[in-house]
Swiss-Prot record:
Expressed by the venom gland. GO terms for cellular component: extracellular region. Changing residue 25 to L: No significant difference in inhibition potency. This is Fasciculin-2. It comes from the Eukaryota. Changing residue 11 to Q: 6-fold increase in inhibition potency. Pfam families: Toxin_cobra-type (PF21947). Disulfide bonds join 3-22, 17-39, 41-52, 53-59. Belongs to the three-finger toxin family. Short-chain subfamily. Acn-esterase inhibitor sub-subfamily. It is found in: Secreted. Interferes with neuromuscular transmission by inhibiting the enzyme acetylcholinesterase (AChE) present at the neuromuscular junction. It selectively binds and inhibits with a 1:1 stoichiometry the mammalian and electric fish AChE at picomolar concentrations. It is highly specific for the peripheral site of AChE and blocks the entry of acetylcholine into the active site of the enzyme (through the Met-33 residue), thereby preventing its breakdown. It has been called fasciculin since after injection into mice it causes severe, generalized and long-lasting (5-7 hours) fasciculations.
Length: 61
């Protein structure tokens, strides 16, 4: 699966992920900025909302 991958300081690049899920991590509270994207599905917490998705490619735009 092709996923977007970046952190707050890097530009988004497309990465070919071994697993078939991508995630998009953002702040739960305003300002709701996106903090990163990547492969897999890490857990969120009280401050971080993690949206995971599988297929199609680039689903974590």
């Amino acid at each position: 699966t092709m996923c977007y991958s970046h952190t707050t300081t890097s530009r988004a690049i497309l990465t070919n992920c071994g697993e078939n899920s991508c995630y998009r991590k953002s702040r739960r509270h305003p300002p709701k900025m996106v903090l990163g994207r990547g492969c897999g599905c890490p857990p969120g917490d009280d401050n971080l909302e993690v949206k995971c998705c599988t297929s199609p490619d680039k689903c974590n735009y």
